[in-house]
């Protein structure tokens, strides 16, 4: 029996399952294609959080974690847990890159600027990592300025006051908060350089809103109608900007939303916007690798481990062709993260990126660029590829806005695209796995506060087999099991590095 061609992995980003219909965009939306597949095709559920994806117990998954595990075909120990462990066991203060940073800043009598997410969301950063770094640097007698990035997306939308207060209460002598900036400005990943400029101008030149202290900055933003994610870049107290000889340490451990701001702060030859005069940094450190380009001007505390024989690498090694498609917001996930942290395409790997719409928030355009993604997906299905990986961003990105009606519209647009994909795959004689990397839009109201729920969830996600082998059934599993499942459909052997198990029962 010949292998189906193409085999498609369709990732409905942020599409989780929850029994209750209330505030559940997936359940409340009109989804005829998804409903039909669930009723007629083999299906099961996957776990996308905690130890099953290499995270601490109870920690919700996210798109980086999800796509890394999917592409690896094994559970990958993620940075959050590794850094947590280093802090707990006491090795963090002796990290070689951190010691080098300390030495260089001291040699120039500089100030250490620390930028990090001030929340315990654990998706891009963690407040405890920031606190630990402040303690180490202040303990070395180095003045510390914190650039506090407020979250409101991976945690409750108006929780920044609590987190900033927690940080203020534990600051050692010699440490202070210099700026308070919502992640909307400091953590863009879609080349909205006007936002990034406002964040870097506050950090570098002390321009923006002003507040006497960090807690007042949060309160003033709330009074202006800004929830935590959108807090306008605010200069705290008499902070006067960065100077020659200062050092900069980015505490974020996820690459995609750190790259732009770091480039604006220090990348040689940067010209996306006018940065003004930038300081001659004595040291520029990142918690993790952000990209090969960033490695040219930064050092790294915790380099990424090499993941060998990812799904893409293994398929390429067998001389097969593959295609990756997503819109801007999720393009790094189906390329960089799915390929184990490598930017370059594999041999025979083609890509298409649809441009995400230039709107302030995606509830204003919940269809996003899904129609363009669907058009190119249908075209690729008929183009002779062996493997296609597609990501629909809408359920996650619109789910993050907390707008239930918009999330329902997003889900319905994705369902239309899914219908087109099913039709094209059937016509081509291919097979498809439909799944998600984590939940989000199935919970749009916070059950504890009654306010909008904007974060990911720990709910299970669906996995559906479309046009699979006759008599096939699926069993429950985790994201690491998807690559072995795809390889089974493609009739390829599984590399020994992949410890996941195919979800298909004959």
From Swiss-Prot:
> Keywords, A to Z?
Glycolysis, Isomerase, Manganese, Metal-binding
Which cofactors are reported in the record for this sequence? Mn(2+)
Q: Which residues bind Mn(2+) 1?
A: 396, 400, 456
GO cellular component terms attached to this protein's record: cytosol
Listed under catalytic activity are: (2R)-2-phosphoglycerate = (2R)-3-phosphoglycerate
Disulfide partners: none
EC top class named in words: isomerase
Subunit and interaction comment? Monomer.
Q: What is this protein called?
A: 2,3-bisphosphoglycerate-independent phosphoglycerate mutase
**Family per similarity comment:** Belongs to the BPG-independent phosphoglycerate mutase family.
- InterPro entries, sorted: Alkaline_phosphatase_core_sf, BPG-indep_PGM_N, Metalloenzyme, PGAM_B_sf, Pgm_bpd_ind
* E.C. numbers: 5.4.2.12
Summarizing the function annotation, the protein's role is: Catalyzes the interconversion of 2-phosphoglycerate and 3-phosphoglycerate.
């Amino acid at each position: 029996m010949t292998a189906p061609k193409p085999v498609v992995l369709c990732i409905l980003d942020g599409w989780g399952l929850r029994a209750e219909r209330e505030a559940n965009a997936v359940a409340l939306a009109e989804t005829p294609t998804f409903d039909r597949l669930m009723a007629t095709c083999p299906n099961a559920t996957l776990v996308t959080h905690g130890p099953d994806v290499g995270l601490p117990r109870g920690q919700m998954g996210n798109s980086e974690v999800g796509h890394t595990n999917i592409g690896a075909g094994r559970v990958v120990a993620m940075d959050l847990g590794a850094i947590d462990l280093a802090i707990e066991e006491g090795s963090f203060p002796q990290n070689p890159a951190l010691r080098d940073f300390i030495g260089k800043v001291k040699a120039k009598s500089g100030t250490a600027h620390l930028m990090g997410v001030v929340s315990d969301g654990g998706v891009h950063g963690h407040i405890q990592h920031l606190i630990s770094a402040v303690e180490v640097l202040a303990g070395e007698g180095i003045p510390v300025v914190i650039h506090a990035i407020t979250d409101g997306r991976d945690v409750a939308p108006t929780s920044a006051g609590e987190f900033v207060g927690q940080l203020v209460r534990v600051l050692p002598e010699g440490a202070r908060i210099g700026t308070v900036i919502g992640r909307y400005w400091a953590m863009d990943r879609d080349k909205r350089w006007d936002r990034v400029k406002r964040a870097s101008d506050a950090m570098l030149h002390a321009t923006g809103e002003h507040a006497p202290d960090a807690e007042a900055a949060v309160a003033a933003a709330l009074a202006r109608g800004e929830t935590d994610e959108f807090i306008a870049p605010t200069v705290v107290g008499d902070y006067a900007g960065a100077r020659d000889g200062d050092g900069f340490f980015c505490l974020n451990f996820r690459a995609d939303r750190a790259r732009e701001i770091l480039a604006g702060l220090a990348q040689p030859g940067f010209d996306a916007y006018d940065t003004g005069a930038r300081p001659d940094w004595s040291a520029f450190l990142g918690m993790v690798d952000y990209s090969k380009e960033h490695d040219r001007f930064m050092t790294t505390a915790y380099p990424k481990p090499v993941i060998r024989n990812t799904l893409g690498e293994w398929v390429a090694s067998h001389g097969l062709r593959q295609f990756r498609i997503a819109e801007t917001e999720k393009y790094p996930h189906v390329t960089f993260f799915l390929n184990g942290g490598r930017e370059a395409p594999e041999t025979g790997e083609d890509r298409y990126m649809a441009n995400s719409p230039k709107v302030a928030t995606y509830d204003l355009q919940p269809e996003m660029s899904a129609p363009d993604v669907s058009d190119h997906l249908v075209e690729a299905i008929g183009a002779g590829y062996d493997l296609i990986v597609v990501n629909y961003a809408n359920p996650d990105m619109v789910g993050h806005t907390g707008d239930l009606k918009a999330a329902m519209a997003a889900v319905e647009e994705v369902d239309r695209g899914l219908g087109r994909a099913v039709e094209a795959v059937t016509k081509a004689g291919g097979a498809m796995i439909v799944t998600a990397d984590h939940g989000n839009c199935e919970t749009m109201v916070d059950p504890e506060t009654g306010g909008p729920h904007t974060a990911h969830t720990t709910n299970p996600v669906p996995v559906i087999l479309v046009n699979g082998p006759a008599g096939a059934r699926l069993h429950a599993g985790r994201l690491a099991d998807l690559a072995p499942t795809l390889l089974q459909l493609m009739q390829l052997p599984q590399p020994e590095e992949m410890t996941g198990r195919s979800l298909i029962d004959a």
